[in-house]
Amino acid sequence: MKKEEIIQAIKEMTVLELNELVEACEEEFGVSAAAPVAVAGAGAAAGAGAAEEKTEFDVVLADAGSEKIKVIKAVREVTGLGLKEAKALVDGAPKTLKEAASKEDGEAIKAKLEEVGAKVELK
C-alpha cells in the first residue's frame, strides 16, 4: 500500500473510525497519541504563557445527561456523523466532539448541546 492510498483511506474515515484507528495504533505500537506536556522551568516563562489567550479549544462531551436521544440528534447536527457513530460517541462519553475549534465555534457547540441537557467542556 502506498502512502497516497493510506492518506486517501484516512480521508474517507469518520471521526469514530479515526478514533478507533488511533487507539489500535497506540495499542499495537505501545505509544500514546497525547501531546507531550512541556514543563515550565522558570516563573517568568509560566507567567508569559498565562498571559496568552487560548485560541483553539477541544469540545468534549462530558456526559449525555437524561435526554440522550436529543443529545444524539444535536451531536449529529454538530459533527455531521451518522446515527450509529453519534450514538456510539454519546454512549462512550467523555469523548472529544471537535478538536482545535475556535472559541466562537466551541461556545456555539457547547450552548447547543447544553440546551438539550448534555454536559460539555472546552479544553
Swiss-Prot record:
GO terms for molecular function: mRNA binding; structural constituent of ribosome. It holds the Pfam family Ribosomal_L12. It comes from the Bacteria. Keywords: Ribonucleoprotein, Ribosomal protein. GO terms for biological process: translation. SUPFAM superfamilies: ClpS-like, Ribosomal protein L7/12, oligomerisation (N-terminal) domain. GO terms for cellular component: cytosolic large ribosomal subunit. The keyword Ligase does not apply. The keyword Endoplasmic reticulum does not apply. InterPro entries: Ribosomal_bL12 (IPR000206), Ribosomal_bL12_C (IPR013823), Ribosomal_bL12_C/ClpS-like (IPR014719), Ribosomal_bL12_oligo (IPR008932), Ribosomal_bL12_oligo_N_sf (IPR036235). Homodimer. Part of the ribosomal stalk of the 50S ribosomal subunit. Forms a multimeric L10(L12)X complex, where L10 forms an elongated spine to which 2 to 4 L12 dimers bind in a sequential fashion. Binds GTP-bound translation factors. PANTHER family: 39S RIBOSOMAL PROTEIN L12, LARGE RIBOSOMAL SUBUNIT PROTEIN BL12M. Belongs to the bacterial ribosomal protein bL12 family. Forms part of the ribosomal stalk which helps the ribosome interact with GTP-bound translation factors. Is thus essential for accurate translation. This is Large ribosomal subunit protein bL12. It comes from Clostridium botulinum (strain Hall / ATCC 3502 / NCTC 13319 / Type A). The gene is rplL.
